[in-house]
Amino acid sequence: MTGFTLEICVDSVALLDVCATPMVDRIELCSALSAGGLTPSLGLMRCAYGVREKTHAMIRPRAGDFVYGARDIDVMRADIGAARDAGLAGVVIGAATQARALDIDVLRDLISYASGLCITLHRVVDTLIDPLAAIDCAVDLGISRILTSGKETTALQGADFLADMKQRAGDRIEIMAGAGVTAQNLTGLADKTGIRAFNSSGSYGGETSDDPFGLGAVATPEHVLSNILRMHAVFNRPNFPN
C-alpha cells in the first residue's frame, strides 16, 4: 500500500498485538474509545514496547471539551513524559480556547515537553470556528499531521471540507481522515478528498465481546484484524485512487 497510511486506534493490549502486522502503519494508543479516546494508562504504554516505533499516544486527560486549565496541563505534561519514557514514537495532542480557536500557548508548552517526539493534532480541529486557519497554525508549530473528520461526525459526511483542508495544507502538513473510516468508504474518501492517510478503529461491523453485565462491549481482536485485512485489500485494488 505504497503511498497510503493506515492508522488504527488501539485501547487494549490485545489490539496492540493485532496491530503488530505491517499492514498497520501507525497506532494511535488510547483508552476509552467510547468517549472519543483518552490518554492510555502507563501500563498500556509500556506494553507497546514491541511496536513502539509506530505507536503514538493520545494525550487527552478527560472527556468533554478541549479547553484546559492549569491542572489539566500538568497532567498532560506528565503523560507526555510517560510516553517518552515508554519509548513511543509520538503523541497526539490538542487544546482550544473558549473562543474556539487553537490555544497556541498551551500547544507550544506541550510541544516543548514533547521535544523529539512526532506530534499529531487531534480532532480538536473539528470543534474550531476556522479549521483552515488552524492548519496554518499547526504548520507554524511544527506539527506533523492533523487528524480530522472535516468538521462532521464522520469523515464521509465531512468529505467536501476534508478536500478543502487537503488543498489548504498542500505538502506542508499531512491531513489524516478519521471517524467512521471503513473498507466500504475508503475509495470514495480518497477519490473525493485527495487524502492518503486514514485513521480507523477497525471495530465497525458490530462484532463485539459479550457484555452481560453492562460493563462495556468491545470489538474482538479477530474482528479488528478482519477489518484491517479488508482495508488493506482496498488499498491494493487496481482502481484505488493514486
Predicted regions and their residues:
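Catalytic cores of alpha/beta
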Residues: 11-22, 65-82, 119, 126-141, ...
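N-terminal pre-domain/capping segments
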Residues: 1-27, 32-39
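Hydrophobic faces of well-ordered beta-strands that scaffold small-molecule active sites
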Residues: 4-10, 27-29, 55-59, 91-93, ...
